[in-house]
C-alpha cells in the first residue's frame, strides 16, 4: 500500500515526475485517477510537447508533422505543478531533486526524461541524414523527409534498423 506524508513545504509533492512527455503525463494522469488528493509536480523545461510516437505515421505519409507538436501548456494537466526547469541532480537519501535554482522534495519519484539521440554514435550517420535517401523517424523533420523518399521510391532495397532495447 502506498503511503504519503503531508509536509509544510511548498516545494514538496507526493509524486515528483522528471519529464513531461507522453510517459510523464500518462503516469501523472494514472496516479491522479487512482488517488485524487495526490500532489503531483512535473519537472519539464520545454514549452513544446512532441508526440514522437506519431512520427512513424509522418514518415509513412499518414499524419502531418504539425499535428505532433503542441504547446506544453495544452497537454500538461491542470492539477499538476509544472516546474519549468531541468533536473540537475538527485539526492535520493533526502528524497530531493535539485534544479538550477531550487530544491524539490517528494514521497515518490518517477524518472522518465525521454530519449537523448546520438546520431554521432554511428560513423557518418549525422552527415548523411537528410540526403541520399538516408532517413530517420526519430526526428520530426527527418520523418517528413522519410515520406518524401518513400513517395519517390521506384524500386531497389530498403534497409531498416532498430536499436536494441536496454
Question: What does each model-identified segment do?
Answer:
Residues 1-2, 26:
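N-terminal functional modules and adjacent low-complexity/disordered segments of proteins
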Residues 2-13, 81-165:
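FAD-binding core/adjacent interface of flavoenzyme oxidoreductases
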